[in-house]
Structure formats: C-alpha cells, structure tokens
A protein has these predicted regions:
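Mid-chain, structured segments of secreted extracytoplasmic proteins
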Residues: 75-114
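Hydrophobic alpha-helical segments and helix pairs
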Residues: 110-147
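Bacterial Sec-dependent signal peptides at the C-terminal "C-region" and cleavage site
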Residues: 16-25
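Bacterial N-terminal signal peptides
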Residues: 8-15
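Positively charged n-region of N-terminal signal peptides that target proteins for export
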Residues: 1-4
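A cross-kingdom marker for long, charged
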Residues: 208-284
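Charge-dense, helix-prone N-terminal extensions
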Residues: 60, 79-83, 91, 95, ...
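Terminal, regulation- and interaction-focused segments at domain boundaries
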Residues: 26-71, 124, 144-208
C-alpha cells in the first residue's frame, strides 16, 4: 500500500481521478428525476442524545439494529427499513441495507448517512431514485432542520467511484473467509465470544450483513482524519455465496470522506492493511 501511494504521489496531479466513472449514467428509475449536481454524503443536525435519536428513528418506522461506540464520546446507531433490506437482498448489494446515525457527544451534533448518496454508490446501475429519495424524506421528517454536509460528490460519479488510479472500486472486495453462511456467521460470533459483532442483519437465506468492530489501534484513524464522519464504523462485513467479504478500505474510507486529500490518505497508508488483518482474524 505504501509503495502504491509513493508511486501515485510521484506522478503529476493529472493522474488524480477521485471522481472517475466506470460505465454510463443510467436513466432514473421509478419516474423520479435523479439529482444533476452534487449530493451530500451526510445530513447534519443539532445534537440529541443517542436514546432520543433511537426513539425518533423507531417512531418514523425504522428498525434500530444497534448503538455502537464508534469513537470516544461518539455513538453510531445502525438502522434499516423494509426498503433498504429489500434492496440489500439483491446480489452484491448488501452494504446498502444499513444506514447510520452518528451522535457526537463531544461536538454536540448528529450526522446521518444520506441514502441517496450511499444508495447510488452501492446500487450503481440498479439504483432506484424513487425508493431512496423516499427513505431520505422519511429521515428528514423525523429529524427536522437537517442540513447537507460539506462532504459531497457529484451524483453522476458515485456509481463508478474510486479514489485515484490504482485504487479499488466498489466491486473489488476483499475475501476474509470461505464456508457456508452458517459456518461463517458462527465464526464471527464465536471470536471473542461475539464482543466485536455490533449488529447482524439477515437479508436472505444466503446473505447476512454484519457490523464489526476494529481493533483499538486500527480505529484511531477516524479521529485522525475527522471524527465528524465516524458513522462509518462499525465496519461492514457481507456473508454471502459461501464467502465473507468486505469492501476494500481504500474505497470505503474515501467514499465516507470525499474531501480527503491524497496527502491525508497518505497519512493513514497502513490502515487498509490493518483493517484486513483485524477482520481476517474471526475467519481463520
């Protein structure tokens, strides 16, 4: 990883392509016009406690899966709904099944993952704007006065996003282990007596999405590059098709931190490898 970054940094700025697309933009599904400009990564709002946030989500019809300490004085609430689960049950789309609400008890704000942003990134050509815009509207109804984050990306670039030349796309997953779905889930839950499993969401007989804690040393990168986006933790693991996989950290971190520069990414160059080591352990 470090060698790759050194090589990338040595080339001209023209080699940078953080918003590169892979494939043509598709027409909006469901008869609802898709955004034509930038889409915010998060919806930010005034501080409320984690318990109050959970109550609001449940009242709006969302299913709260867990509340996880993602950073010191900060909690991530993982939540879903029938629409997200149905979309996540489609082949290679499990990551879209869960949205996150980060409660920052230090800076007294909340941040919610934007279903339109992550929906387009994870669903790609199968994205249905009518569905994901309704999920977003339901969130905004439950949490009035939310504002778009400064973190954002052009909607048309989300489906084919990768950080730069040589970096992975969404589909370039890391295989953590192989076996039956039941065997892989059991391994994840038996490791450390299940202490690192933040949530478990069954999407079909063959597919389950886990939220998994990283090691204490590994997860410090969040505070280094910006605790405001700590909702990316716990790390998602997909168990499907006889494999446990994770989206590559170079992709997941850059998607969650679209304002991250090459120099800032270079400052956490060892993190992608450390994440693989952490998440490989349960499946050995």
């Amino acid at each position: 990883m470090k060698k790759l970054l050194t090589l990338v940094f040595s080339v001209a700025v023209l080699s940078f392509c953080g918003c590169a697309e892979k494939g043509a933009q598709v027409q909006a599904a469901g008869g609802v016009a898709e955004p034509t400009g930038d889409v915010s990564t998060y919806l930010r709002g005034a501080y409320i406690s984690a318990s109050d946030a959970e109550a609001k989500l449940k009242a709006a019809g969302f299913e709260v899966l867990s509340t996880f300490e993602s950073v010191k004085d900060g909690k991530t609430i993982a939540f879903t709904c029938p629409t997200l689960k149905a979309e996540g049950a489609k082949p290679n789309r499990a990551n879209v099944a869960v949205m996150r609400l980060f409660v920052d008890e230090q800076d007294k704000v909340i941040a919610i993952t934007n279903p339109v942003y992550f929906g387009k990134a994870y669903m790609q050509k199968e994205y249905n704007h009518a569905l994901f815009s309704k999920v977003k509207a339901k969130i905004e109804s439950a949490f009035p006065s939310l504002k778009d984050s400064e973190d954002k990306m052009s909607f048309s670039n989300l489906a084919g996003f990768h950080f730069m030349i040589g970096m992975p796309y969404y589909e370039d997953v890391e295989v953590l282990g192989e076996g039956t779905t039941a065997e892989l889930i059991a391994k994840a839950k038996n490791y450390k007596k299940g202490a690192d499993v933040a949530f478990e969401l069954k999407l079909s007989d063959d597919t389950t999405l886990l939220g998994y804690a990283l090691g204490g040393g590994t997860k410090r990168f969040v505070s280094k590059i910006g605790r405001q986006n700590a909702g990316l933790m716990p790390y998602p693991i997909v168990i499907s098709g006889g494999k446990a996989t994770m989206v590559k950290a170079e992709y997941y971190i850059a998607l969650s931190y679209p304002l991250l520069t090459m120099m800032e990414f270079g400052g956490i160059a060892s993190v992608p490898g450390d994440i693989i080591k952490d998440l490989n352990k349960p499946f050995k």
